[in-house]
């Protein structure tokens, strides 16, 4: 019986998906309820490479999603899921061996609605360190984080999943909605910092180690004020083939 469904959004991920799946296999092997209680779903966003073929060969369920919208991709994966627990991780990440056990333990607590594992970074530099320092206060104040994001399937549907009207920050909006839902019944988001995922630095490799300060922050205000600027920022940063 499937207990836990892991959804992996993917677009042209033949290079990095195998190393993620290697770590997922290790986490499934360590799962106290057995590897067969975990299903892995790759939501393929119209890849031009062999992502779907690779995922199928590795035993993953595969769902094809046409719109270039990360929220729609995550939602399509969730719609295919059978587990009572849903989790989401990016294809360029790697997961900790105790991830699924830690998520089970967290959601067994009566005061937890969901959360995330947080991440460790593959490499550091001054620009990356300052970016991290700029972001971490928000994480600490809100309890929201990245890495492997998880919740009960019932709560995912209660908040409507990821907002497909949003071209960016849909993950933040989802966690805000989950947080609001939890507060209605005395629950909170949690961070599982003892099982952090490992995040790749490909955004920094492509855009530069200082790009949060030279591109993202300067582009944030226009993106808030003008839909066209928001679309262009999302396209350049998230939806290019060489992202």
Description of each model-found segment:
Residues 155-158, 166-186:
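A short, conserved alpha-helix in the catalytic core of glycosyltransferases
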Residues 25, 32-46, 63:
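Short beta-strand/loop segment that forms part of the nucleotide-sugar
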Residues 97-127:
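Conserved donor NDP-sugar-binding/catalytic core segment of glycosyltransferases
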Residues 65-81:
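Glycine-rich, basic loop-to-helix element that forms the pyrophosphate-binding segment
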Residues 50, 89-106, 176:
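Acidic donor-binding/catalytic loop of UDP-sugar-dependent glycosyltransferases
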Residues 86:
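Short aromatic/hydrophobic "clamp" motif used to bind/position activated sugar donors
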Residues 13-32:
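Short, well-formed alpha-helical segments that are part of the catalytic scaffolds
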Residues 23, 44-52, 93:
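A conserved acidic beta->alpha catalytic loop
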